[in-house]
Amino acid sequence: SGDWSGCEAVAITGGRLSTASGRVQLAVPDAERREMMQSAARSAGTKALLYVTGGSNALQGKSAETAAALAQAVEDGGYDGLYLDLPQLADNRRTALTETVAALREKLGEKLLYVTAEAPAWQGKTYSAYDYAALAASADRLVLRVAPYQKTADGFTVAPLEPMEEVYCALAELKDTVPAGKLSLLLTTAGSQWKNGKRVSNPNSGEIAELLADEKNTESYYSSRYACAYLVQKAQGNTVTVWYLDRQAAEARRQMCAFFGVDQICLSSLDAVSQQLLEGLR
């Protein structure tokens, strides 16, 4: 849960799309949890969306059948719309996603339709599975997920969340393809914790606050290069590094979005979010 006031929509997790023997299968959140979350959302004056994710077999059925199953779940569950998040789609699913989202637009009518797309990559892998213009034409919002950046130099892990270079390049790449009012930037509200060069956990704001409170063993920093906060804790022979978005980092990303005319930011979770991060978005 969390404070949802000021949010346009809240996505209720628990939906999962898959295909077995050509048949579309859709798991949805249980009724008790759904009703509790919908009630909280409406009390805050925000829309409640059904959040649906899926793996590599999510779009192997017919697009019309997939869209029909998703739209029916939205209707049956009394949701205000759908948030479809199919991460790192293979290139051969491009047409299926475009067709499914177009069919969803028709079936959902006035209900909200949010779709996540991997941002065009500046470094490394480029995702060509997303027809950004076509998806944005059908969806109310195209939510961009920016790839994390990870490297180790001299034993120190550099792993900023939603790196600014990547954010800039993604928005610059899409500015002539997708109307700014259709875009939203996804920000990770949890941190990224590393030990001995390996990612070990995703601490929430409370856990990060605990580490910062250990002033004897913890130093906090802000990387202007990546516009991201990080802390280093050295205790009992171990070194732990946590990268996270604080007020300054959130504000930098909000300003970058504003520069490109993008007026919405999507938070990965309100359970893990810090007041600092929220302040940076105001």
PLM feature spans:
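Catalytic domains of carbohydrate-active enzymes, especially glycoside hydrolases
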Residues: G2-R23, L70-L84, R253-S268
